Amino acid sequence: MKLNRMLSVFALVAALTAASVSFAANGPHTSSKFEGPKANTGTVTHTVENGKSILRVSADFKVPDTPAPTWRVVDSKGNIYTLDAFKVKAGNNEKREVVVPSYVHGIVKVQVYCAWAEVLLGEAGFSSPIT
């Protein structure tokens, strides 16, 4: 009887711990500061909104003045995923957030990449992989 009670308490503690870890994993995560030759201001924050994984640069981030600055992410296995361009062709609008595709998991870095010159402009890392 005592063993069953201890197992029940242990199962409850394990479930609560798993729930709190899951909740913390879905909370906002902010990267280190961008570092690189052209992208060296601001940070990027990861959030989950309406079931979508979103990356958003901070207000102090300056989009590099290059022909084709582009969002890229690197996962924990070293795979690189090229996402959207920072600049919208119509006018001087900037795309300061991007939805991460559902097949991308374990993001450890966000990069600003010039797709035209094929050169890395800067990157920011997370303290642990973002799922």
Where do the language-model regions lie?
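Short amphipathic, basic-aromatic surface patches that mediate peripheral association
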Residues: 57-61
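Beta-strand signatures of extracellular beta-sandwich domains
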Residues: 70-74
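Bacterial N-terminal signal peptides that target proteins for export
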Residues: 1-10
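Transition segment at domain starts
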Residues: 23-50, 129-131
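An anionic, turn-rich surface loop/hairpin at beta-sheet edges
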Residues: 77-105
